[in-house]
Amino acid sequence: MDIDHGRESDGEMVGTIASCGLLLHSLLAGLGRRAAGFARKVGGAAREDPRRVAHSLKVGLALALVSVVYFVTPLFNGLGVSAIWAVLTVVVVMEYTVGATLSKGLNRALATLVAGCIAVGAHQLAELAERCGDQGEPIVLTVLVFFVASAATFLRFIPEIKAKYDYGVTIFILTFGLVAVSSYRVEELIQLAHQRFYTIAVGVFICLCTTVFLFPVWAGEDVHKLASGNLDKLAQFIEGMEFNCFGENSVANNFGGKDSPQMHKSVLNSKATEDSLCTFAKWEPRHGQFRFRHPWSQYQKLGTLCRQCASSMEALASYVITTSKTQCPAAANPELSCKVRKTCGEMSLHSSKVLRDLAMATRTMTVPSPVNITMATAVKAAESLRSELAENTALLQVMHVAVTATLLADLVDRVKEIAECVDVLARLAHFKNPEDTKNVVVSTVSRGIDEPLPDVVIL
């Protein structure tokens, strides 16, 4: 019996060890899969935008440089323990784009300077009140902190200040409260204010140097690429609509499937990115083809029109997908149906061509080629189609075709507004004239110059 009992105990122990081994193996396998998945995400983020790797290295370099202020004894003796503020400044100010770093850096430096001056003035006023009694100074400081913090916080609700100076107002409240409250216990208040400002100035200077001079990422270039990319996406949708719904061998059921263009949906979600990039671009100095007072607000207007156009596309796509999945009655007037189909194809073709031309002109910063003929053809087709549908008595029997045509005609109107907006942008931003560019190339070739040609684009 003892032998059998011992064998049973050994068997249970072996089973327990085997279960633990399987559990450990599954845990290690799961950990390995998660690590591999995380590595793929890291690699994907780096491949999607290699500038992210450069930015990460720049942040590390900036922190390494600002650490010298804390590690070198002469510098540390000059700034004291406040030198740590330089390190904190680099951490909170360093941003991905030059404009964002300039915005936060200048906001932080200016807010610290103004708040320090006001806090020193508050301390002087509190010292005068101390003559009236021993508790006069803390009471005055408390009242001043209350009113200044309340007023500054209320300013953050103003849209203009919220958009550009929200971070600066926050730093103002922090610095004023820190210096004003510390003035009651610290004797060398002026020295404290100086040290805080100098350390923040050092941190901001290092951030700006590493951001501007080492592989800079300009918000202006990003918003410019975003605008031209959105135009390309809209053109891609209309081309897909023309091919799948109004072409000679089109099958409407194919539209809305996995292979149908859906890029217009990303245009609808681009407002937040576009607004932030435009705000940061206004802080950036002149660079490349972007002048000092470049019309960044016009990019926001163009983005608004693109999103309105994308909304019309979304309505059109939803209706086409819905009608393709339902049984629609046969048209009583095949001739009208054929005419509507042909006209819709013409509107789609001309609209996509206009958007492609506008995208190329925006991307290369050249004056758009005259789109009056192409746009006029699309508008004329839309107007004639509206008149035809309004006068036809068999409209109810081709209602699904009529609705599609009406939505597409509205889409043509949106494209026309986009074309007008790009023309205004080209005029305000002083886009290059393609004819002047062409003349430069012809003149260079005619003189037989073997030097490299300038970076020009012939449209």
From Swiss-Prot:
Membrane topology classification: Multi-pass membrane protein
Gene name of the record: ALMT1
Cytoplasmic side: 130-137, 182-199
Regulation: Activated by external aluminum. The enhancement of malate transport is not due to alteration in the selectivity properties but is due to an increased anion permeability.
Listed GO CC annotations: plant-type vacuole membrane; plasma membrane
InterPro entries: ALMT
Tissue specificity remark: Detected in root tips.
Organism: Triticum aestivum (Wheat)
Membrane spanning stretches: 53-73, 74-94, 109-129, 138-158, 161-181, 200-220
Protein's UniProt name: Aluminum-activated malate transporter 1
Function (record text): Malate transporter critical for aluminum tolerance. Permeable to chloride, nitrate, sulfate and malate.
Keyword presence, Transmembrane helix: yes
Induction (record text): Not induced by aluminum.
Extracellular topological domain residue ranges: 1-52, 95-108, 159-160, 221-459
Localisation: Cell membrane
Similarity annotation: Belongs to the aromatic acid exporter (TC 2.A.85) family.
Pfam families: ALMT
Record-level GO BP terms: malate transport; monoatomic ion transmembrane transport
The UniProt record lists the keyword Transmembrane: yes
Keywords: Cell membrane, Ion channel, Ion transport, Membrane, Transmembrane, Transmembrane helix, Transport
